[in-house]
């Protein structure tokens, strides 16, 4: 995981997938459930596709495999809290 970067209107961080199965139903569900707990907008991008971080099927639609880079972007009033929590979570589940 690269460090959290704070832009003018959002916070972003990147993560390289280490799970042998990539981003799949189980870990996508864990990310989406965690993301739903925050008010800010959360997007995840990989391979030229962008997903709503709060929607499991949207995340699975990224078709991200082991070694792929995920870019997480949070924008809203609780973006810092969301970024900190999600950054720790992805290290454990993806």
Model-assigned labels for residue ranges:
Residues 6, 20, 54, 83-86:
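Generic N-terminal initiation segments characterized by hydrophobic and/or small/turn-forming residues
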Residues 1-9:
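Short, Lys/Arg-enriched N-terminal segments with co-localized hydrophobic residues
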Residues 61-94:
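C-terminal structural segments of small proteins and small subunits
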Residues 10-19:
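Short amphipathic
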Residues 18-52, 57, 61-66:
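Compact, glycine-rich, soluble single-domain proteins
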Residues 12, 39, 69:
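Broad gene-expression machinery/nucleic-acid interaction feature
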Residues 16, 45, 73-75:
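Solvent-exposed beta-strand sheet faces enriched in polar/charged residues
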């Amino acid at each position: 995981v690269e460090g959290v970067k704070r832009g003018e209107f959002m916070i972003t961080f990147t993560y390289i997938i280490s799970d042998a199965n990539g981003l799949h139903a189980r870990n996508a569900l864990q990310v989406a459930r965690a993301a739903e707990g925050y008010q800010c907008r959360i997007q995840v991008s990989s391979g030229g596709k962008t997903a709503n971080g709060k929607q499991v099927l949207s995340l699975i639609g990224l078709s991200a495999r082991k070694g792929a880079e995920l870019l997480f972007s949070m924008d809203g009033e609780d973006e810092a809290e969301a970024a900190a929590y999600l950054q720790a979570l992805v290290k454990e589940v993806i």
